Amino acid sequence: MKVLVTGVNGQLGYDVMNELNKRGHEAIGSDITESNEYFNEYVQLDITNKEAVEKVITEINPDVVVHCAAWTAVDLAEDDDKVEKVRAVNAKGTENIALTCKKIDCKMIYISTDYVFNGQGETPWDPDCKDYKPLNVYGQTKLEGELAVSNNLDKYFIVRIAWVFGVNGKNFIKTMLNVGKKYPQVKVVNDQIGTPTYTYDLARLLVDMAESDKYGYYHATNEGGYISWYDFTVEIFKQAGYATEVLPVTTEEYGLSKAARPFNSRLDKCKLVENGFKPLPTWQDALSRYLKEIEY
C-alpha cells in the first residue's frame, strides 16, 4: 500500500510514518519544510497551494492520504491577522487534498478535534453528532476541513482526537515536566474533562484504518476513563517521581486564554470496537511508555 502522510514534522505525522514503515508499506512524508531529517521518502508540500497539491498527489498516486498537517496554535489563531492563514491551512488546504483524492479515487484520513463541538455538558460526544458549535477559530476551521472531506468524498475517515502528546514536538506533558522541575507547586485546571491521546498508539489505529474500508466518523483517544488536566498532571508527576504539589483551580480562576477552551472534551469511542478496530491502551499505560521513550 502506498500512503502519503502530510505534516510529518509534527508529533502525529512522525509516528504515522514510522508505523507505516514498520508494517512494510510505502510511506511518503510531506510538510512545508524543504527537507526532513528522519525520512528519505519525503516531498515538500504547501497544502494551501492548490496546484502544488494536485501535482504532488497525482504524481505520487497514493492509495491513501493521511492528512495530519494543520494549524494547531489555538490561541494564536484568534489574532485578527492570523485568521485567514489558519483558514487557508485547516479548511482550504484540506479541501485541496480532498478534491485531489476524489480525482484519483484515493482514501483520505483527516485528523480533527473535539473543538468542533461547543464543549458544554457532561455527555460524551458521539462521532456522528452533527450539532456543531465551535468555540474558537481553530475549531471553526477544523470543522470547515471536516465538511470539505465529507462533502467531496465517499472513501474517508474523519478521526477526532484530544489532548495529544508524542515524542516529536511540544505538548502538555513536556510543559508540566519542565514547570514541575522549577516550582514547588503548580496550578492546573480541574473543570476541563477529556482523555489524552498518545500519537504512537493513535498511529497504529490510523494505519489499521488505512488498511480497511470501514469509512466514516470516529473518535479516538486512549482508554482509561475521563479525567481533568489536574488529574493528568498528578499522574504525570507521580510516574516521573516529582514531589511537586498540584493545586486544582477552575478555568475562571486560572485566567483567560485568548481562545475559549471546551469544558467537555469527552469523546465516545464505542464506534471503534463496533467496526472491529482495536481500542488504544489506557492513558496511564501510554504515559508510562512515553516517559520511558523520552528517557524521563
Each language-model region and where it sits:
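Rossmann-fold cofactor-recognition segment
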Residues: 34-49
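N-terminal Rossmann NAD(P)H-binding glycine-rich loop of SDR-like oxidoreductase domains
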Residues: 1-23
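NAD(P)-dependent short-chain dehydrogenase/reductase
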Residues: 147-194, 200-201, 208
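SDR active-site strand-loop-helix element
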Residues: 6, 30, 65-69, 108-113, ...
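NAD(P)H-binding glycine-rich loop region in Rossmannoid oxidoreductase-like domains
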Residues: 47-89
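Conserved C-terminal active-site "lid" loop/helix of NAD(P)H-dependent oxidoreductases
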Residues: 228-234, 250-290, 294-296
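Catalytic helix-loop patch of NAD(P)-dependent Rossmann-fold dehydrogenases
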Residues: 84-96, 116-159, 164
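Mid/C-terminal beta-alpha module of Rossmann-like enzyme folds, strongest
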Residues: 205, 212-257, 263
